[in-house]
Amino acid sequence: MKSIIIASLVALAIAASPALDRTFSPKSEYVYKFDGLLLSGLPTTFSDASQTLISCRTRLQAVDDRYIHLQLIDIQYSASHIPQSEQWPKIKSLEQRELSDELKELLELPFRAQIRNGLVSEIQFSSEDAEWSKNAKRSILNLFSLRKSAPVDEMSQDQKDMESDKDSLFFNVHEKTMEGDCEVAYTIVQEGEKTIYTKSVNFDKCITRPETAYGLRFGSECKECEKEGQFVKPQTVYTYTFKNEKLQESEVHSIYTLNVNGQEVVKSETRSKVTFVEESKINREIKKVSGPKEEIVYSMENEKLIEQFYQQGDQAEVNPFKAIEMEQKVEQLDEIFRQIQEHEQNTPETVHLIARAVRMFRMCTIEELKKVHTTIYTKAEKKVQLVIETTLAVAGTKNTIQHLIHHFEKKSITPLRAAELLKSVQETLYPSEHIADLLIQLAQSPLSEKYEPLRQSAWLAAGSVVRGFASKTQDLPLIRPASRQTKEKYVRVFMQHFRNADSTYEKVLALKTLGNAGIDLSVYELVQLIQDPRQPLSIRTEAVDALRLLKDVMPRKIQKVLLPVYKNRQNKPELRMAALWRMMHTIPEEPVLAHIVSQMENESNQHVAAFTYNVLRQFSKSTNPCYQQLAVRCSKVLLFTRYQPQEQMLSTYSQLPLFNSEWLSGVQFDFATIFEKNAFLPKEVQASFETVFGGNWNKYFAQVGFSQQNFEQVILKTLEKLSLYGKQSDELRSRRVQSGIQMLQEIVKKMNIRPRVQQTDSQNAHAVFYLRYKEMDYIVLPIDMETIDNVVEKYVRNGEFDIKSLLTFLTNDSKFELHRALFFYEAERRIPTTIGMPLTISGKMPTILSINGKVSIELEKLGARLVLDIVPTVATTHVTEMRFWYPVIEQGVKSLQSARLHTPLRFESTVELKKNTLEITHKFVVPENKKTTVSVHTRPVAFIRVPKNQDSEYVETEEKTISHSQYQMSTEEIDRQYETFGLRINAQGNVLSQWTLPMVLMTEQDFEFTLENKNRPVEFTARVTIGNLEKTDLSEIKFDKIFEKEFDLENNESENRRQYFHKMIREIQSEQGFKNLITLKLEAPQQMYWNTELRTVCDKWIRMCKVEMDARRSPMEHENKEWTLRTELLAARPQMPSSLRQLREQPHREVQLALNAKWGSSKKSEITFNAQLEQSTEQKKFLRNIEREYKGIPEYELLIKAARLNQVNVVSEYKLTPESEYTFSRIFDLIKAYNFWTVSEKRVQNEDRRVVLQLSVEPLSRQYMNMTIQTPEQEVELKNVRIPRVVLPTIARRAMFQQTWEKTGATCKVGQSEVSTFDNVIYRAPLTTCYSLVAKDCSEQPRFAVLAKKINKNSEELLVKVVRREEEIVVKKSDDKFLVKVDEKKVNPTELEQYNIEILGDNLIVIRLPHGEVRFDGYTVKTNMPSVASQNQLCGLCGNNDGERDNEFMTADNYETEDVEEFHRSYLLKNEECEVENDRISEKKNYRNKWNREEKKSDYVSSSDYENNYDEKETENQLFKKTLIKEFSNRVCFSIEPVSECRRGLESEKTSNEKIRFTCMPRHSKNARRFLKEAREQTVADLVDFPVSFVESVKIPTACVAY
């Protein structure tokens, strides 16, 4: 038994022995030759590249089974720019470089490693070794680290079977290599005596990877772009060759490519290999080292020290740049700024020097920065001083910021300049607590208390810096993430700032600072503010906005917080819309979107509902790759909603996405407005610009916004202060106003109306303009009462403008000089490589801007002159770089795109009043002996920099321009010279004939445009003169040949129409006319000119006009004579009917146009147009089908639609030159090609040189167009062309006013028993012989009231009373005529205009209010009000016009009731003149619970609704007419007569059977499709002329009821 146990233990020991996986035999010494290659260039083998070859011999002693000792000897390296090759370069082809003794000693220090299962598990280095040297030695050990077999417990059964075969094997395992702990794929292949092991690293599956990233925190997470849009793609493959179980060769090949739009543009490549040389016994042992145990993974300790120094400054434990002496740094910086000072103009070289200065400043200590200040800054010119300040701010280390703040406090840098410099600090690459604390101290300092711009910039910068280390971003710093205690500390600081704030602006600034910080723990404080109804609305809205940077960190939390805010109708509409806007950017899932859609469908506030619909619709259409999932979800939820917003809603959201899906790149423009009902200013306006480049998403790259609360009060109070020079002295007007006010007060007293006081605090009224850049609030400009008061007090004295102070301010000559260096962006990523060097991939865009100039304003008695002299100079370079760094060498490749602009400018503008003529002159001057230069250069560059042994001397980089040979062949030389206007223009360069962005990055191009003026100054002048209106005779306007045969009407009415038209023209010509002259003269040197005269003659009401335009210009190329243009346009519109009867009986209802144009130089082209704007056959049929007699308001609103002109006929005769004819022909061909699928054409023979065009717009939807064009040779027809919805002109009187109310206003209709409120709520309430208050301004200072009553108990006619502050107006209709009394005095119709009263036709009167108007036809009172009003707190039967449907029934004493009778009684004006009809008022059948009126579907709906509303049965049962549809497989049938249906929300109570006629048509026919679309929205009006297909009995409701 014992023997069995012993044998088992021996077998187990043998199995556990590492001998089978052992690479080296104990007590043996091996010598391997190491070769390492660095290559930087383009991803092509046909271009040069910078290459460095490092070689040495490696002594390796296997001490035992586990440990090996190593030492590097015979180290040498060479570097040059040579062509790329698949083979290793020969060392002789490269330039030999010298390695200093100090660096060689570090590399030759021994090191020790432990190997387990073939893998290097531990490494020990000498205590004297440097970190960079350790990483170099790791790269050699990395070549010996190999797992020869898969771990048994991780092998699959197939792999175990393959293991027995041993010919090949594949397995995956996690393994630590030089580049991190990642998944590695092994392949083992047996080739005779050789065994080849290959392993590749999967960087997508890494547990840890030593890398850093800076400057990426301003981007947003785009999950859809992560895989496809990788900017840097590394690839690493190892190959091990064993022969007879001995390692003969080991090689690793790594490629790092930078990709743009999916194409590789630059690459860096490393190759390393060890080759077996000899094996022997150990003769001279390598010294054993006993340093701390470390891993094989690349050590970022050196990078960590650099990061700590940048972030902590002199407080860091180690200064990694201590080896560079202070004198060396100061000397280099002195040389840099000396060269900048020598450059009078900014060039790309200046930009390069600035980038070097930024890099050098980051290495400096406080003491060294002081030395720079005393030795360089104080002795430099102003330009250099400004550049030094901005480069210190761009450097953004703790030391440079501390140095700047020191000089802020000493005021050697002005506070305004300090505020500007802090904007660059916001973008620092190395944010830290130390920097944040410095900025907070500055914000709380006494200096900042005195200078608000500095304090604001300090707080906003502090918030942005805190985000860099306390929030989750795409940056990958080496320091550990901020602890919870650190986050809580800054949340407390910012919230304490909020709580200590006295003004709204201060609180907003605190929240914007907190928003910039983006700390996840701040969500708890923000939620409390959002949900606290005691907080001002502006604070709650700003708290919602402060959640913006948490959208990627905690999207579900934000949705959980904001969804209840959005759904709670007790919240203000603007807060709810802001919550929705912020919630949508968290990319919600479908269940959340379903909640949003459900709320939208049941929403009582029209602004909220419309804004919600627009947001969902715009997101559903987005092509932004980062919104693709959200777009699909929004499209899905919108499929199931029937909601359609009203057109007049001002709260909206729109976006313009411009993206290329293949490149994952593009831009998007967003625009959003948020309004509320009781404000004429928007509550929020935002315009933003976001970008996606190669999958990198910048959500808020730039955004401007305006937000305000109660700012209308500030404006009104300011206007009161600016009210001019005393009060009116008109005693009569004063008595009338007092009388009107007294009547309004009596109404208030009798009805016990409680004033609707706005619950706003004038002290909290404010507005804020803000600029957001790279997700940071950058600038906040507050405007409040105090700010405006200061301006008013400065320039207004005793109600009058202080002209002298204003003139003194304006006429001061102002010289200015601006120099600003900045980085538009800077980002870098550092990753390890298999050769032991870090690879830094960076992108930056250093820029310098200089503007020198002078501005002056001269004011004269009747004019003013502005002169601006400036010389702007801009230079910028975009650098994309991949760089290897070692103390012994710096190598890499970069792609440079440089641009430069230098242009001296002089601009003069003069405005002058001469002899009743206004003259405006603009003059642009090119100065003499000055040159304008615009240049662009692109080139890829390979570079090598080898420091010399003396560190004090700066070594210039060895650069070589490289290019993609195939792309470079596509370039073409440009060398062109022009001379025009006395200016010499040169354009020369070498540019790509066709290009893409990757091609630009891989080719050398240069282009320079110069404009030089060596003679006297060259002036370009534009002069406009506008003359006064003068009286003239209209007889010169002749309408001779204006009618064409194509204009003839049907039914032989043409002759009658023409006689009527000419009679109308003669009547107009007998009246007084007016003429006006406008001239435009453009003048340039060398007698170049363009002169234009525009002469207009019209009658007083613009019924007939003649417009003449004469233009002349100087001859151009190939012209020997002056070019002229003469045009004459005649236009006449018909009389404007005020009733349907007038419209029907009016013979001429068309607009006539005649245009003659003649142009050319030696040869003239002439064209004549006669056009007629008319009604199409379909529109005329609609007018004929109006059989019922309408009166009053329904008649007029139907007139607006019936009088629309939707068709234009044009007849043109022409005589064109061949060139002009060719141009028109090409345009015609382009139109046909663009509408290819809707075009039909046929060959015809028509009259020569004559074209006939007919264009008609479908009048119902106004979104489809038909067009027919007849030329001499062909007839072209375009059918059903989709166009944007157009507004058709109408000839009805006051039509534009009506359409304006429909689009932007709110309307209330009150009949004898039914009311439709401003907020679209319909209810029944009977009017009596006592006045009921229809609508009233119920503010503390009321301006109007509208009342109505029945004339007597049994009458259907009403009497309306309108009380304005000036007078009381009473109107009633008697014997089809309106009787009007003003202050109890009867007024004749001819005197109505002076009281702002107008009669339209025979049945409608309009009374204008201070804001709005009242329309009355004897039976219905229609009140139109603006949709937004500042002081109009309305009350009455029409509701409060606040946009909410759920709070309409507010009684006179301002409390809400659900009892409609109680609501109605509160607005009854009881007096001795009337008898209250208590029985009628109390009878419940006269009241009905309210319901929401359906949204207006189209302009024609109201027409049928009016017919229904005036039908007694319809009024009783609430029925409406609709076309009935029956659908079959191949046909669709429509009821010829409309069928009654119950309104939405009601159900049929009684029904009857009626026989209905149907007409059927094929489903695929054009009419079927059109009628189906119409029938969904209203009655189809065109079915009478269709044949009857069948008759069927249909059950029709006769009464409806609401349950």
From Swiss-Prot:
Description of the deletion phenotype: Simultaneous RNAi-mediated knockdown of vitellogenins vit-1, vit-2, vit-3, vit-4 and vit-5 increases life span, causes accumulation of neutral lipid and an increase in lgg-1 foci in the proximal intestine; however, does not affect fertility or pharyngeal pumping rates. Expression of transcription factors pha-4 and daf-16 are increased.
A GO MF term: lipid transporter activity
Coiled-coil ranges (or none): none
Domain VWFD, first and last residues per copy: 1306-1475
UniProt keyword annotations, A-Z: Disulfide bond, Glycoprotein, Secreted, Signal, Storage protein
Glycosylation sites: 1266
Signal peptide range: 1-15
Domain Vitellogenin intervals: 24-685
Domain of life: Eukaryota
A GO CC term attached to the entry: extracellular region
Cellular localisation: Secreted
Pfam family, one: Vit_open_b-sht
Disulfide bonds: 1308-1438, 1330-1474
UniProt cross-references to SMART domains, sorted A to Z: DUF1943, LPD_N, VWD
Tissue distribution: Expressed in the intestine of adult hermaphrodites.
SUPFAM superfamilies (UniProt xref): Lipovitellin-phosvitin complex, beta-sheet shell regions, Lipovitellin-phosvitin complex, superhelical domain
Function of the molecule: Precursor of the egg-yolk proteins that are sources of nutrients during embryonic development. Together with other vitellogenins, may play a role in modulating life-span, acting via induction of autophagy and lysosomal lipolysis.
Protein name: Vitellogenin-3
Organism: Caenorhabditis elegans
Source species taxonomy: Eukaryota, Metazoa, Ecdysozoa, Nematoda, Chromadorea
Gene that this polypeptide is encoded by: vit-3
